UniProtKB/Swiss-Prot annotation:
Belongs to the bymoviruses polyprotein 2 family. This is Genome polyprotein 2. It holds the Pfam family TMV_coat. Residues 502-539 are annotated as: Disordered. The gene is RNA2. Transmembrane segments: none annotated. Gene3D superfamilies: Helper component proteinase, Tobacco mosaic virus-like, coat protein. InterPro entries: HC-pro (IPR001456), HC_PRO_CPD_dom (IPR031159), HC_PRO_CPD_sf (IPR042308), TMV-like_coat (IPR001337), TMV-like_coat_sf (IPR036417).
Length: 894
């Protein structure tokens, strides 16, 4: 049976827009008259099937490269009657659950793009349409891809089939292609000539009326919400990404271990240098990332891969290999080991996020998010991607600390002289389900050809003794300069005055303080300076020592009352941290931070600023947790790093730290429990879900009587409880109009909960009830209007029904798009927080330590306009001092 020419023209328009375009790796198959009858991919297996159908085994020998100007549309237009459609015959089919022969009419020349495979359902129907309905069916076919879009739900596809059966009754008994289902990705696929994907299940439906029965029986079922799209493959591959196929990837830990081992060796011998060069040349594998491949065992969060062909690590590796090849020839034997270690240091620094602004580290989630290449079989895996990105951030932060320890640890003399390096494993594992034709192959390049070697004029041999003498003289001059600086610049001293603790600047010896000699002290703003202590009286002075160091630090003169106040506050803070008095910490954090700032002004070497930063961060994190119900792992990781630094400085913590308290409260949050239970109930079907939602509302009402709920807990309780009761009211309502209004209200409440909790929950009961009510209303209105109507009126009514269903489908598409936008925004915000938060935390700690180590704040003591010492407590809510931004930094003076 030939297809109606009008319908065929409509399909040609659809194929131009939604079929996979011909590319350079596709082949054309011609018949005995050299007329094209099919286009196939280079790895397609349908040629044998086509040969069996046409009973012409010579077709397999008639493959020729497709001309660049020939595509699917031109094939159809050139010879629409030269076998454009073929009967693809399987030896057995599972239509209807039984095994029997079934001839199915389908396209041999087209494959639909990812997400539009549902169009294959209409191809067999096109042969059964009567001529009177040809124009209507053509319009139906042309409008459907724009109406449903890519990856519609199964319920939307079945609703369209119901509408098609109503408009075109002759297709009710028509066969449909096999519909496959993947239980792992929760995705349907309407198969084409390529057949059923491996390990996929078969849907028991072989004709249109069986699909309509499935639509009626599946109302409210969860699988009705699963997407219908193409078989699993990557949605697209950018031409700019082709370099990843040949790039070398090596496991991060393997490369780190190789470089750490290299720092322990001696490179005075030629064999040792060759061994390191060979190890670097053989490190890494190609084809780790390809068009059909994404990292072996890509979902293991502990496996992170390093791209050795991306800057900055590629540049440092090239410099290291060039030095091992020819660069060492200009150096003395005694200097080669040191220079090799310096090059290895630079390579290691590029692997640390603490030293390098960019990172070459990838896992599957980071690669997909950065390049926007998503695996279709894992439709909607944003939550898993967030977890993998979070694991990558924690891994890089942890390894940055490990690399820093390696750089510090490898300053000892070299003791090994004969070394064979640790080479990474022979080949990475390939997880099941990945294409077997894309196997990673190790790079085995010869050292002399691995890196281009530049021909340069080597400089003359350097004089070792001359360089040693210059170094000794430089060290002596530096020591003299440091001693002179320390002798001329004296530390600030704070002394008791009659009205206020003024800052005193001494310009002479200590005896000048009592004799009136020297430069004296600065004048007060309104008159004479306060009187000095009477001669002969002795003022007790104490020295604030740096608790972070075992050596004696700069002594600071404080009056007894001020020191007593500071010491009491500091001991209170230490006691609160040791006993984990979380309530006291939150209540007094502002006052304690103010005191710690003042203590940092008195002694910049002590870790008072670090402690103030920790207390301020704990307060802000806990406040944010109470308001939003969320605290990221990266934030907690930054607090754990600060706690380790404070322990090293002598601050003792008890069995449970404030960070662990926040972590425990987040894990035991009532809102988290309600959210988890709500997501579980949303997956239930039928009356069980309604009863479970009512029970959840009762549980929430009981727990809301507790007095320790956060603001976010109260908001979550109110939202979830209201929705649970709304669903129960809908189930008890019998009036269709009232029920539809309640469904609209409950759907809005559901979207609000998704926005608040960051979920993507859709209760099947609400969507099923809405579809049922609208379908009934349309059918009742159509039945009333058709009685005694003319054919033109019936056609207009059918078009109106189609417009109603199209409007309903568009509304569901908009709802799904809004949910995807919310999920994408949440994912992007989470990525920014998880990537930037730990890096900023480490950077702030490093900048603050460097700033105070250089005595930045003490420079205020030598400025004549220095006001008063902030000894008294500041007002509550005063922002803490931050390096390079606070009022104490010299760049901010006016």
């Amino acid at each position: 049976m030939m297809m109606n020419s009008t319908i065929r023209q409509g399909w040609q328009q659809v194929l131009r827009r939604f079929s996979i375009p011909a590319s350079g790796d596709r082949l054309i198959v011609s018949n005995s008259t050299d007329q094209p009858i099919g286009l196939f991919g280079a790895f397609d297996t349908s040629l044998q099937t086509l040969s069996q159908v046409t009973n012409d085994p010579e077709i397999l020998k008639q493959k020729s490269n497709i001309p660049t100007h020939l595509d699917i549309a031109s094939v159809l237009e050139t010879s629409p009657r030269s076998f454009p459609w073929v009967f693809l015959t399987n030896s057995f089919c599972t239509f209807g659950g039984s095994i029997h022969a079934q001839n199915l009419q389908a396209f041999a020349t087209a494959e639909f793009k990812s997400g539009f495979c549902y169009m294959n359902l209409l191809i067999p129907l096109s042969f059964d349409i009567i001529d009177a309905h040809a124009d209507s069916f053509r319009g139906f076919v042309e409008q459907l891809p724009d109406t449903l879009g890519a990856y519609p739900s199964l319920s939307m596809v079945l609703n369209v089939m119901l509408h098609a059966a109503t408009r075109f009754p002759e297709i009710v008994a028509s066969p449909v292609p096999t519909i496959a289902f993947d239980a792992e990705s929760l995705q349907f696929h309407v198969t084409d000539k390529r057949g059923v994907p491996g390990m996929w299940n078969i849907l028991k439906a072989c004709r249109v009326y069986e699909l309509l029965s499935l639509a009626a029986d599946g109302i409210g079922c969860e699988y009705m919400l699963y997407p219908v799209g193409a078989a699993p493959q990557y949605s697209f591959w950018k031409k700019s990404m082709d370099h990843f196929i040949s790039d070398r990837f090596v496991e991060f830990l393997a490369m780190q271990g190789l470089l750490a081992s290299a720092l322990e060796q001696d490179y005075k011998t030629h064999d040792a240098r060759d061994a390191l060069l060979t190890a670097l040349q053989n490190a890494g594998y190609t084809n780790v990332v390809a068009r059909e491949r994404r990292f072996p065992n890509g979902h293991d969060p502990s496996t992170v891969w390093l791209n050795l062909n991306e800057a900055p690590i590629s540049e440092k590796l090239t410099e290291l290999k060039r030095y091992l090849l020819v660069g060492h020839r200009s150096d003395e034997i005694a200097d080669i080991t040191h220079n090799v270690h310096q090059h290895v240091f630079e390579v290691l620094k590029t692997m640390s996020v603490q030293f390098s602004k960019t990172t070459n580290a990838y896992n599957r989630a980071r690669f997909e998010v950065n390049h926007e290449v998503i695996w279709n079989a894992e439709y909607g895996r944003s939550s898993q991607q967030n977890a993998e990105l979070e694991a990558l951030v924690l891994f890089l932060n942890r390894q940055s600390l490990e690399i820093e320890n390696i750089l510090r640890r490898t300053t000892s003399p070299v003791v090994v002289t004969n070394w064979q390096p640790d080479v990474p494993p022979a080949a990475p594992e390939i997880s099941e389900g990945e294409p077997t034709h894309a196997v990673a192959t190790p790079i085995t390049e010869a050292p002399t050809h691995a890196t281009p070697v530049e021909v340069v004029n080597l400089p003359p041999t350097r004089s070792y003794w001359a360089e040693t003498l210059v170094g000794v003289l430089t060290a002596i001059l530096g020591t003299i300069f440091a001693l002179l600086t320390r002798a001329l610049i004296r530390p600030k001293r704070l002394r008791r005055k009659s009205t206020f603790p003024w800052v005193s600047l001494d310009s002479g010896d200590e005896d000048d303080d009592h004799s009136g000699g020297g430069g004296g002290s600065p004048q007060t703003p309104g008159g004479q300076p306060p009187a000095s202590p009477a001669p002969g009286t002795h003022q007790s002075r104490f020295s604030v020592q740096d608790i972070a160091s075992d050596t004696s630090l700069l002594s600071v003169d404080l009056d007894e009352d001020t020191l007593s106040q500071y010491d009491e506050t500091f001991q209170t803070i230490r006691r609160a941290l040791f006993e984990n008095s979380f309530g006291d910490i939150l209540q007094n954090s502002a006052r304690w931070i103010s005191t710690l700032e003042a203590m940092a002004l008195a002694d910049g070497n002590a870790p008072y600023t670090l402690l103030a930063q920790y207390l301020n961060g704990i307060e802000e994190a806990y406040t944010n947790f109470r308001n939003t119900g969320h605290i990221s792992r990266a934030t907690l990781s930054g607090f754990f790093v600060l706690e380790d630094s404070l322990r090293a400085a002598g601050i003792a913590f008890g069995g449970t730290t404030p960070t662990q308290t926040i972590q425990n409260q987040s894990a035991d949050s009532p809102a988290r429990r309600w959210k988890t239970r709500f997501e579980q109930i949303a997956c239930e079907l039928g009356d069980a879900s309604i009863k479970s939602l009512a029970d959840l509302a009762d549980i929430i009402d009981t727990e809301r009587e507790r007095g320790d709920l956060t603001q976010f807990d109260v908001l979550a309780a109110s939202s979830i409880s209201s929705l649970c009761r709304a669903v129960r009211i809908i189930s008890d309502t019998t009036d269709p109009n009232t029920q539809l209004a309640l469904v609209e209200n409950a759907t809005a409440m559901q979207n609000n909960i998704n926005a608040i909790l960051g979920t993507n929950v859709s209760i099947p009961f609400l969507s099923a009830t809405r579809r049922l009510l609208i379908t009934r209303r349309i059918q009742e209105a159509g039945a009333e209007s058709r009685s005694g109507a003319t054919p033109d009126t019936i056609q207009q009514l059918a078009d109106a029904e189609l417009a109603e269903i199209v409007s309903e489908a568009n509304m569901f598409n908009e709802m799904a798009a809004s949910q995807r936008d919310i999920a994408n925004a949440t994912r992007e915000a989470t990525i920014r927080e998880h990537v930037l938060s730990p890096v900023n935390a480490l950077a702030n700690v490093g900048m603050a330590a460097a700033f105070f180590r250089s005595g930045g704040l003490r420079s205020r003591a030598f400025h004549p306009t220095m006001p008063t010492m902030p000894g008294s407590p500041a007002a509550i809510g005063r922002p803490m001092f931050q390096a390079f931004r606070g009022r104490g930094h010299r760049l901010n003076r006016r």
